[in-house]
Amino acid sequence: MKINEIKPRMNNVETAGKIIAKSEPRRVDTRYGPRSVADVKLEDDTGTINLSLWEQQIDLANVGDIVSIKGAYVTEYRNEIQLNIPRSGTIEVVIKDSNKQDILEL
């Protein structure tokens, strides 16, 4: 699914894109106790979307990586939609640091 096709309250979303920005992890209190979360901006050829990475997911992907996301759900926060990956969902790095690869191809 392309990013511009993603709408609020969708479930079981599968998409892919390049991580173009990533925040430093921060601690938040959840109903499961304190957890770490980082926000990333995911981009494809149709647009961008915010994505929350929790705990172990944070170290899986970095700026420049192209990732595949499966089983995500969509929420709306401050009038912007964002992807969330539940425990049953996955994020997989398809190409590690595509920026370096682009440079090598030149």
Predicted regions and their residues:
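Short secondary-structure boundary/capping segments within folded domains
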Residues: 7, 31-32, 41-42
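Short, acidic/hydrophobic/Gly-rich beta-strand patch recurrent on exposed beta strands
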Residues: 38-44, 82-86
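Short beta-strand-initiation
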Residues: 1, 35-37
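OB-fold single-stranded nucleic acid-binding module
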Residues: 23-33, 49-50, 56-106
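Beta-strand secondary-structure signal
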Residues: 14-16, 39-41, 50, 68-70
